[in-house]
């Protein structure tokens, strides 16, 4: 390396002699082709002191004596000898030792880095790292010297190393004389050397080592802080896991390593006699290359150094572990997302009806299916009747005879219907059953009709129409009396001047038979079923009105429409054998295959506003008749509906008793809490598990509780209206189908379900926690 004292600028070669005659009291700055540094010469231009600075730092260091020649980056400055040289800051390169005033220099370095001041630098093609060293003189002043840490050479040989023996530094030694120069080839890793302790700085020791004509200085750092010297790989010391090992084993390992290295060094130092000096020099060069080989970037087992330690050491190899793999969290793919969407769709139940409404819907569907076939049969029957049969008017007359012969005969009393044979003018006799069986039939009929949800407004309209028709029938009675064939009853009405009787109510119980009303049919209609099985065609014709018959054609001789309560029995039917064939054919041609029963309604008032009229055979009219009969007005079905007010007082009392016994009263009440048959207490606001067919157990909240009882106190049902969590729908369920939420959580909760199910469970759990006993007591404090 060419270190020229006070190197002049371009074109100033003649001034080199003048620069060489500088006085000892003057410090000079010169050019050094190395890293961006500034070279400082001592008074004798022998020692080079590396010091990188900017113009501001140079002014702080001391007064500028002169500015020598040069331009651009080759400007050379001079500073006074008496200035404090250690205050000059080091910018980019941080050597292990920076002089005596270590702390003050470090503070100025940090300040200079933050200010980002422009600096005057000297560039070099291939930078060479430098290490500062301090040489103590006999006391005149402190001198600094520069030592290269690595060997570098140029192709043209323009640069020379400070290791060159031509560079005389003997005058920097002690006052006794110069130190004999010798190389470092004799030093090997693991050998023991004697160093001088210069400074003690917290966890570091500044030491210097003299070897021949060379002086080395460095810092020994405390390894307990988990980091080593700058850029020097740890070879002698064990790995960083030494804390877990005992101290004795570490010392033994280090001793064994030293012994091995000493043996190797002895073999290398004592070459055989036949080895030439050229081979010795080559081996020395190989050893030097091994010692100066740059350490690897990473070391297995080395700790992570502190961040500031890394920041202060640029372009150097620092012992640190290999880079760790960055663990990136993988995005979780929810496999059950599509199922959660399906659950959201399924959350609106396909069957939101309770059991009672579900049965009604099923019955309506069955009727709709029958509409197509029944309507087709009705049209065919009408067409055939119009071709073969003329218009038939039936005039119904009722006759009640007072029989005083005894109670036995009054019990046997029954109405006989005479139906004329259209071809021969003959008729058949049908006996009407007893009063109690008719009352049972009427009660069953009322129950069937009340089970259907019908429109009350339509019922009132039909009742008004029935009144008008009844008045018209009274006017046309005499004119049409002898025009058509008639239907006579053997018993006449005694009190012919009595008020208008209620219109007829036609019921077809076979059509509406289902699971619910089958049980109620058994006690009252056993004879009716037997008659249907025995002579089905005859009963069809005898009890069913023709489809072509108009409502206005129903007439009575004097008192308008008369009431008949009839029920068919197979033992009471008398049909001549010659008429059976015709009756069977007519029965087959009929529009309906069901039995039509005409039932009378006993009125408590003179008007017929509380009565219902069913006067057509078509299916649509039957539906309207259900709506007519489902009004909120009270109906009484006494067994003796055929009797007039002129009957005996004993029979009227019996009728009242029977009618009261046949009435079924049911009372419903909304309560805030109730006890289930299994002993559980359920309150309004409770969180429960509920189940609907096709869905899992789902959390719900009880909104209301309804208890239904008979008039004798017998419990009929306990029902709750619930709202589902995560859904706006509500449902009516029996209390027996509900289970407490918290008590049955483990058995009801399904871990596999996600989405809205989990959301509903979370909401229900929060609501259950908020439902404390105090809140529950407040909710059930008042009965509704």
Curated annotation (Swiss-Prot):
Consequences of knocking out this gene: Embryos exhibit lack of retinal tissue combined with a reduced head size. Defects in neural crest stem cell migration and differentiation seen.
Single biological process term from Gene Ontology: neural crest cell migration
InterPro entries named among the record's database cross-references: PWWP_dom
Localisation per UniProt entry: Nucleus
Ranges annotated as biased composition (Low complexity): 1-10
Stretches for region Disordered: 1-29, 399-443, 468-570, 609-655
Domain of life: Eukaryota
Occurrences of domain PWWP (ranges): 684-744
Any one cellular-component term (Gene Ontology): nucleus
Alphabetic keyword roster: Nucleus, Transcription, Transcription regulation
A GO MF label: chromatin binding
Protein name: PWWP domain-containing protein 2A
Function: H2A.Z-specific chromatin binding protein which plays an important role in the neural crest cell differentiation and/or migration during early development and is essential for the development of the head and eye. Acts as an adapter between distinct nucleosome components (H3K36me3 or H2A.Z) and chromatin-modifying complexes, contributing to the regulation of the levels of histone acetylation at actively transcribed genes.
């Amino acid at each position: 390396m060419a270190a020229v004292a006070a190197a002049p600028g371009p074109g100033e070669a003649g001034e080199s002699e003048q620069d060489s005659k500088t006085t000892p009291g003057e410090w000079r700055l010169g050019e050094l082709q190395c890293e961006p540094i500034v070279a400082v010469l001592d008074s004798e231009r022998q020692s080079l002191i590396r010091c990188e600075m900017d113009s501001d730092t140079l002014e702080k260091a001391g007064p500028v004596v002169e500015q020598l020649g040069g331009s651009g980056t080759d400007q050379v400055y001079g500073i006074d000898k008496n200035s404090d040289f250690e205050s000059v800051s080091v910018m980019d390169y941080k050597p292990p030792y920076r002089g005596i005033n270590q702390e003050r220099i470090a503070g100025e370095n940090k300040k200079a880095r933050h200010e980002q001041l422009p600096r005057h630098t000297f560039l070099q093609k291939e930078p060479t790292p430098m290490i500062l060293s301090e040489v103590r003189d006999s006391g005149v002043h402190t001198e600094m010297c520069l030592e290269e840490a690595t060997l570098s050479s140029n192709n043209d040989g323009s640069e020379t190393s400070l290791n060159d023996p031509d560079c005389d530094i003997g005058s920097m030694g002690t006052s006794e004389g110069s130190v004999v120069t010798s190389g470092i080839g004799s030093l090997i890793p693991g050998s023991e050397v004697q160093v001088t302790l210069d400074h003690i700085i917290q966890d570091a020791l500044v030491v210097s080592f003299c070897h021949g004509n060379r002086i080395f200085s460095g810092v020994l750092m405390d390894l307990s802080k988990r980091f080593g010297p700058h850029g020097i790989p740890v070879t002698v010391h064990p790995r960083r896991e030494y804390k877990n090992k005992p101290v004795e084993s570490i010392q033994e390992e280090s001793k064994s390593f030293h012994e091995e290295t000493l043996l190797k060094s002895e073999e290398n130092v004592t070459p055989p006699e036949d080895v030439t000096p050229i081979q010795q020099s080559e081996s020395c060069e190989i050893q030097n290359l091994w010692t100066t080989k740059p350490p690897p970037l990473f070391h297995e087992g080395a700790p992570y150094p502190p961040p500031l330690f890394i920041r202060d050491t640029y372009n150097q190899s620092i012992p640190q572990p290999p880079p760790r793999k960055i663990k990136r969290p993988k995005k979780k793919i929810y496999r059950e997302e599509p199922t959660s969407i399906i659950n959201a769709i399924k959350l609106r139940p396909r069957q939101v009806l309770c059991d009672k409404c579900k049965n009604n819907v099923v019955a309506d569907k069955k009727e709709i299916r029958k509409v197509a076939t029944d309507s087709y049969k009705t049209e065919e029957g009408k067409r055939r009747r119009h071709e073969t049969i003329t218009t038939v008017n039936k005039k119904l007359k009722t006759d009640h005879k007072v029989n005083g012969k005894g109670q036995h005969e009054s019990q046997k009393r029954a109405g006989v219907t005479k139906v004329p044979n259209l071809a021969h003018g003959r008729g058949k006799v049908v006996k009407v059953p007893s009063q109690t069986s008719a009352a049972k039939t009427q009660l069953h009929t009322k129950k069937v009709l009340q089970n259907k949800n019908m429109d009350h407004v339509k019922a009132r309209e039909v009742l008004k129409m029935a009144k008008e028709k009844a008045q018209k029938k009274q006017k046309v009675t005499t004119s049409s009396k002898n025009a058509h064939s008639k239907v006579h009853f053997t018993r006449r009405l005694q009190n012919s001047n009595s008020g208008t009787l209620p219109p007829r109510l036609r019921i077809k119980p076979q059509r509406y038979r289902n699971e619910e009303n089958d049980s109620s049919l058994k006690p009252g209609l056993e004879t009716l079923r037997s008659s249907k099985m025995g002579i089905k065609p005859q009963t069809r014709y005898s009890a069913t009105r023709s489809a072509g018959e108009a409502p206005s054609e129903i007439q009575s001789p004097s008192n308008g429409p008369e009431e008949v309560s009839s029920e068919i029995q197979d033992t009471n039917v008398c049909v001549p054998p010659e008429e059976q064939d015709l009756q069977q054919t007519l029965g087959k041609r009929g529009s309906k295959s069901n039995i039509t029963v005409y039932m009378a309604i006993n009125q408590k008032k003179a008007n017929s506003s509380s009565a219902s009229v069913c006067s057509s055979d078509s299916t649509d009219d039957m539906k309207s008749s259900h709506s007519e009969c489902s009004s909120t007005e009270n109906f009484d079905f006494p067994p003796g509906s055929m009797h007039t007010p002129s009957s005996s007082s004993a029979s009227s009392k019996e009728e009242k008793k029977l009618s009261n016994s046949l009435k079924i009263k049911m009372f419903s009440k909304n309560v805030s809490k109730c006890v289930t048959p299994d002993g559980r207490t359920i309150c309004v606001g409770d969180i429960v598990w509920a189940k609907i067919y096709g869905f899992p157990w789902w959390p719900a909240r009880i909104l209301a509780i309804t208890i239904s009882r008979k008039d004798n106190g017998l419990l009929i049902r306990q029902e709750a209206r619930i709202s589902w969590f995560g859904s706006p729908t509500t449902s009516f369920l029996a209390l027996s189908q509900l289970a407490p939420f918290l008590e049955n959580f483990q058995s009801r909760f399904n871990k596999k379900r996600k989405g809205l199910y989990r959301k509903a469970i979370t909401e229900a759990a929060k609501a259950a926690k908020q439902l404390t006993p105090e809140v529950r007591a407040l909710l059930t404090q008042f009965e509704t």
